[in-house]
Structures are given as C-alpha cells and as structure tokens.
Amino acid sequence: LVGSEMCIRDRCMAVCVQAQKKNFSYKFYGQVRGDLFYNSRANAEIGDGSFHLYPKDVALDADGKDLNASPNGSFYLLYSRLGIDVQGPKVGSAKTSLKLEADFRGSGSNWAVLRIRHAYVNLDWGKSAVLIGQTWHPLFGEVFPQMLNLSTGAPFQPFNRSPQIRYRYTDNGWQLTGSVLWQLQYLSAGPNGKSEEYIKNSCVPEVYLGVDYKKPGWQVGAGMEILSLVPRTQNEVDGKIYKVSERVSSVSGEAHVKYQDANWLVMAKTLLASNLTQTCMLGGYGVTSIDPRTGEQEYSPYLFSTSWLNIVYGKKWKPGLFLGYLKNLGANEALVGKTYGVGLDVDQVFTTNLQLSYNLPHWKLGVEYSPSIAWYGNVDLQDGGRIHDTHSITNHRVLGVLIYTF
C-alpha cells in the first residue's frame, strides 16, 4: 500500500510539473566564433586584442626606437556564446519573458571564464513594457554598426551591457524609453582606475531618456544620458586622513538614423559624449580646484564629439563600409591637477573599416581591413586639457572571422 501511495504521489507530481511546463516555451541558441587578427602596431584595447580602440602614441626607448611600433596578432574563440530565451505564463495581463546569455570572455585578465552577457526578465503589457536585469545600454540602442570587429564601432559608438530597470512605451510608431542603470562589467574611470565604487558611492544611478520614431524601412531617434559619480570619499594630507565630499556630474546626448530595405542598410549616429568611459568610449574628468587643508577636489568632465556612418549591401555576399571620427573638446574649465579617464591625451581619431562577408544559413565567413589614425600632441591643462601641436599615428588592422550560429 505504501508503495502504491508513493507511486500515485510521484505520478501526480509529474503531472503537475508537466502542466507547469506547458506554460513555458524555450529557445536555446548560441554561436562559435573565431577571430584571427593582425595589427601593425600596439593599440589601446579593451581586455585583449580582439577589442581594438585606437593606435598608441610613439614611446621611444634609449636608442630612440618606437616601442609601440611592433606588430601583434592572435586567434581567439573567447566570444563564443550560449543563450536561452524563455516565454512564461502571464502575470495579470502582462506577457512574461526572460533571457540568459553568457560567453567565455571572463573579466580582466581572467580569460576563458564564463561571463554573463544578458540576464533579465521582461513584462510586456502591449504598449508598455518593463525590463529588469542586465542587457544593452540604451546608448548602444537599436542603431549600431553592422561590422565584423567585436568593438562594434567603439570608441565612436557606445558599447556596454549594464544592470538596469527600463520602461518603454510604444504607440503608432513612437517609442519612448526611460532607464536607470548601474555598473557591473563596464566601469567608469577614476582615481583608482576603472571601478564600480564611483557610482556605488554616488547612490545615484545613471539615467537615460530617449525617443524614437519608426516606419517601414526607417528609424530616427535621440537620447540623453546623465551620470553622477563620487571619485573619492576620503583623502590623506601629511599623514592625516580627511573625509571629503566630492562629485562629478555629466550630461551626454545622441541622435541616430537608420534606413533598411531588401539589400541596403544605412545607419549613422552622432554623440556629444561627456565622461562615458563606462561605454568603451574616450572621456573622463580633471581636477579644477584643490582644498589646501583637506585635499578635497572639484572636477570638470571632458567632452568628446563622435560620429559614425555605416553602409552594408547584399544578402549572401555583403560588402560594407564604416567611417568613424571623434574629437576631444576638452573640459569647460582650466585644470589644475590630475586627470582621470581614457584617451585624454588623444586629440582626434579617424577609422575606416572595409568589410566583406559570405553568409549562409547559420554560417558567416568574413574579412575586414581597418586603418585607424590617432592624433596626439601637447596637453594644455589651462585650456581645459585640449591638445595642440598634433602629430598622427596609424595602425593597420586585418581581421578574419568565422561564425557558426545555432
């Protein structure tokens, strides 16, 4: 009798589990990706050579030889990935879904370690939707370059996935987006290098507001981002430690456009980027005043102007062109102390990407050639850190990519 009761109970549990599963649908996906690349000289990079930003300046040794004028290259499969999309039962009138996606990039120098790319739930009421979790930063958005390089247009295009709470309203072609964001893998620069502590100590999340209008074949939009960081909470002067109250706030804006038909894809975006180092862009801030007793500092953020254009044609054979340009506009005030950021010694960067890919169902094989020019010079702190008397440095990058998706 006991055995019969256990059997009946197990069958009931199996029926209940099966009934619950009927309310869910699952879609597994992924890709194996190999990146083979060559650079003619050393470059500023994110983590490894797969994520290229711009060429480094001349660094002379004792014999007057350029230490950075050495080629490099490698072959990586770190950005292969696995993911799952789940459609769940309704919560009230809201459709529910979630996404989990990971690759093997790891973090820092810990390569070939599983890393979360996306992890979020989404509640969709039709016109309104709320997303909670980690996904693409809204500055990355729906308009981003179609290219082979993993940088996807950085440092001209924001590149970032962050924990966030996002509200989106869609009606009659209009799409309104509001997000509050925190930092996890993509971090702001500051006195202790790149760290989460600056936004954590701020207690104020990053804020984004944007609007898009869509019609068949077209999308246009604009957005604004606000970031407020606390660089330090204490400082030491002559062996004495003082509590300090510091904050640096910045506002960035962007506008974008996209056209697509059966064969053509044309996109462009322009930004006024202020202290967007957490998005793999150039930027940061500098010290404008220092309290002589406590060492407490005030700051001014740098402003960078960036723009890019991307054109891709075809279906099976896809030639493409990407053009990116950025300019260091400096800070609004004279600087009297240290600067913190990425690429603050760079005046301009111009990059061209020429790509050709062969596409089949589940397969992509492509090659890309990318000459990149950076201008360096003398940093004038009294002029807000702007660069004068510049000279140019060029890197030639060749990339081969093989991708199998499922």
Name each region found by the language model.
Residues 14-21:
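Boundary at the C-terminal end of the N-terminal hydrophobic targeting segment
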Residues 21, 73-79, 111-118, 156-160, ...:
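Transmembrane beta-barrel outer-membrane domains
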Residues 21-48, 58-186, 203-204, 208, ...:
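Outer membrane beta-barrel
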Residues 39-43, 109-111, 141-145, 185-190, ...:
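Outer-membrane beta-barrel proteins
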Residues 67-70, 105, 148-153, 188-197, ...:
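Extracellular loop and loop/strand-boundary signature of outer-membrane beta-barrel proteins
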